[in-house]
């Protein structure tokens, strides 16, 4: 954490609506831009492992992202086939072949990434959307029409399938971003939002929706939890009966948990078969 940046960001955010044009021009905008540059390079992360098996959210970085909207004017963003009218530049604006090679990221036509997002080596961006402050680890694929929300954290060697979404923190304002740890598979049209954490090497099947209020039922133990999918889980959508027995409500079901050896030897499709047995 760069203490020389934290204090100015905290002070400016406390006066968000009363900042003067002069101080924005003289100090706040340059400071915010330095923070956004750090998010792009991976020097800063909105959320990071705490070395105790959990995650720590760096609130000052969220505030810097929000301040970016305050200290920048709406502008023309060049694009094809038509320009955009936005406050945030394209992540790869001005890139040439040399810069793309150095970044090691493959960006397919139709992919949109905003400034302030980080991409590790060997990331593949299909036509998708990645918002400001997001972190995408090395070797991860963001598939067609997938969304990585503002400040969302997506680990290394993950696959975010077509139409899937990882929720951000800015709209609506959330305390924590959604976090997908390393080596996870998120199935098509699934959504992980509201600061939910998916543990490493987990498989989320197609069409699974998990928020902080979603019941996560472990079929093996009968336990119900919220907001956290343990590592090596295989999760599908399901239902649990209401207490009065008149109806059922949606839930996510952990149908099995596999060890690392099994996960390495088994394809994703095989892991998702037979869960109705």
Curated annotation (Swiss-Prot):
GO terms for molecular function: 2,3,4,5-tetrahydropyridine-2,6-dicarboxylate N-succinyltransferase activity; nucleotidyltransferase activity. Keywords: Acyltransferase, Amino-acid biosynthesis, Cytoplasm, Diaminopimelate biosynthesis, Lysine biosynthesis, Repeat, Transferase. GO terms for cellular component: cytoplasm. It is found in: Cytoplasm. Its main location: cytoplasm. CDD domains: LbH_THP_succinylT. It holds the Pfam family Hexapep_2. Substrate binds at residues 106, 143. Pathway: Amino-acid biosynthesis; L-lysine biosynthesis via DAP pathway; LL-2,6-diaminopimelate from (S)-tetrahydrodipicolinate (succinylase route): step 1/3. The keyword Acyltransferase applies. HAMAP family: DapD. Belongs to the transferase hexapeptide repeat family. This is 2,3,4,5-tetrahydropyridine-2,6-dicarboxylate N-succinyltransferase. It comes from Xylella fastidiosa (strain 9a5c). The gene is dapD.
């Amino acid at each position: 954490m760069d203490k020389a940046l934290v204090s100015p960001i905290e002070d400016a955010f406390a006066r968000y609506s009363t900042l003067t044009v002069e101080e924005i021009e003289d100090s706040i905008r340059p400071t915010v831009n330095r923070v956004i540059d750090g998010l792009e390079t991976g020097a800063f992360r909105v959320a990071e492992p705490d070395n105790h098996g959990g995650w720590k959210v760096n609130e000052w970085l969220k505030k810097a992202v929000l301040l970016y909207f305050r200290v920048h004017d709406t502008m023309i963003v060049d694009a094809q086939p038509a320009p955009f009218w936005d406050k945030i530049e394209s992540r790869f604006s001005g890139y040439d072949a040399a810069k793309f090679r150095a970044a090691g990221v493959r960006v397919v036509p139709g992919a949109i990434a905003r400034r302030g997002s980080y991409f590790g080596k060997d990331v593949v961006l299909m036509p998708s959307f990645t918002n400001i402050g997001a972190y995408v680890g090395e070797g991860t694929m963001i598939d067609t029409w997938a969304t990585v929300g503002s400040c969302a954290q997506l680990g290394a060697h993950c696959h975010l399938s077509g139409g899937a979404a990882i929720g951000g923190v800015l709209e609506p304002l959330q305390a924590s971003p959604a976090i997908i740890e390393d080596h996870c598979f998120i199935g098509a049209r699934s959504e992980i939002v509201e600061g939910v954490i998916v543990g490493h090497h987990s498989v989320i099947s197609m069409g699974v929706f998990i928020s902080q209020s979603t019941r996560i039922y472990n079929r093996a133990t009968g336990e119900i939890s919220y907001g956290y999918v343990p590592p090596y889980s295989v999760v599908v959508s399901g239902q649990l009966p209401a207490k009065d027995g008149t109806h059922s409500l949606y839930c996510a079901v952990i149908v099995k948990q596999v060890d690392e050896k099994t996960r390495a030897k088994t394809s994703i499709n095989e892991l998702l078969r037979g869960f109705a047995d």
